[in-house]
């Protein structure tokens, strides 16, 4: 076995308010072969911001963008993906907001993200989508409308979208493809199935989407790679000191990759394709 290729994290979070923060995360990741990290907006309340306040949404976006800049400054390529998690919808409904008001608020949050993307400060919208837990059909309908709007805006901007969804295999993928067809999404590879289950990989790839597979969940990458090599991987790191073992941190991706190489589950060409080639194609960055 030769030199291990550089490793990438397609979807992770950093918390400059309560966590290790972008600088320390970047330094740890770089020391362990990390070359790229997609930095995705956290929930507003993770940063002591108020759900339902567009001014605080703007602060959330600016903190995410600045975190990506700090990571870039530490020698790890980084891009910002900004938007509101579907849990924000649920939180506002629980607070007594009507569905129309929540919908309007989420649309404004996407429009705000679009302004940053137009200026080149962010590259995508996310994570938007549907709750992965049980909610009422009215909430699902609302979230689907938000997804449709996000895909429409992203299509016009040429931006990526990180979708947070339930993990129901082909049924989940089919529902997203229907929305994409309605919108007329052309570059389907820019629609990223965040936290994709193995059952979402084959139908996702067959429909041109990009499954982003959590590399730290036991057995899931191994099953996913049997379905297709046309994937990316993520840590979904949350940078929460209260939950240090919730997910794999970015700086442990390399050891996981080495384990997979030693077991013969993947080879170096597979890792280069997943960790370098696919990331370069998605985000227009270069690993050097």
Spans of model-derived segments:
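Acidic (Asp/Glu)-rich catalytic clusters
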Residues: 2, 26-33, 64-79, 110-123, ...
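Divalent metal-dependent hydrolysis catalytic cores, especially in the metallo-beta-lactamase
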Residues: 6-17, 24-59, 73-88, 123-124, ...
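Conserved, mostly hydrophobic/aromatic
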Residues: 11, 125-127, 154, 236, ...
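Active-site-proximal loop/turn and secondary-structure-junction residues that shape catalytic pockets
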Residues: 14, 43-44, 84-88, 129-132, ...
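Active-site gating/metal-coordination segments in enzymes
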Residues: 53-152, 210
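Divalent metal-binding pocket/active-site signature
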Residues: 114-198
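Short acidic/histidine-rich active-site segments
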Residues: 164, 229-247
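Mid-to-C-terminal alpha-helical segments outside catalytic/metal-binding sites
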Residues: 254-288
């Amino acid at each position: 076995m030769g030199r291990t290729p550089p490793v990438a994290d397609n979807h992770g979070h950093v918390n400059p308010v309560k966590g290790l923060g972008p600088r320390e995360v970047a330094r740890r990741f770089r020391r362990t072969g990390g070359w790229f990290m997609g930095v995705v907006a956290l929930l507003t309340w993770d940063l002591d911001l108020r759900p339902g306040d567009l001014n605080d949404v703007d602060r959330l976006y600016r903190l995410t963008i600045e975190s990506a800049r700090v990571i870039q400054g530490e020698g790890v390529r980084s891009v910002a993906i900004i938007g509101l998690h579907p849990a924000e919808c649920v939180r506002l409904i629980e607070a007594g907001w009507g569905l129309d008001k929540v919908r309007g608020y989420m649309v404004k949050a996407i429009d705000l993200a679009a302004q940053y993307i137009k200026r080149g400060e962010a590259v995508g919208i996310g994570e938007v989508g549907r709750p992965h837990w049980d909610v009422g059909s009215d909430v699902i309908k609302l979230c689907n409308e938000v997804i449709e709007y996000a895909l429409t805006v992203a299509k016009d901007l040429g931006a990526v979208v990180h979708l947070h969804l339930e993990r129901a295999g082909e049924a989940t993928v089919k529902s997203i493809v229907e929305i994409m067809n309605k919108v007329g999404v052309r570059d389907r590879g820019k629609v990223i199935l965040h936290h994709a289950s193995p059952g979402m990989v084959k139908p996702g790839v067959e429909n041109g989407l990009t499954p982003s597979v959590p590399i730290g969940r036991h057995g899931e990458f191994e099953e996913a790679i049997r379905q297709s090599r046309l994937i990316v991987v993520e840590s979904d790191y949350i940078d929460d000191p209260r939950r240090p073992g919730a997910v794999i941190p970015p700086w442990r991706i390399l050891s996981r990759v080495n384990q997979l190489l030693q077991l013969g589950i993947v080879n170096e060409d597979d890792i280069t394709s997943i960790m370098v080639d696919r990331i370069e194609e998605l985000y227009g960055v270069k690993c050097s």
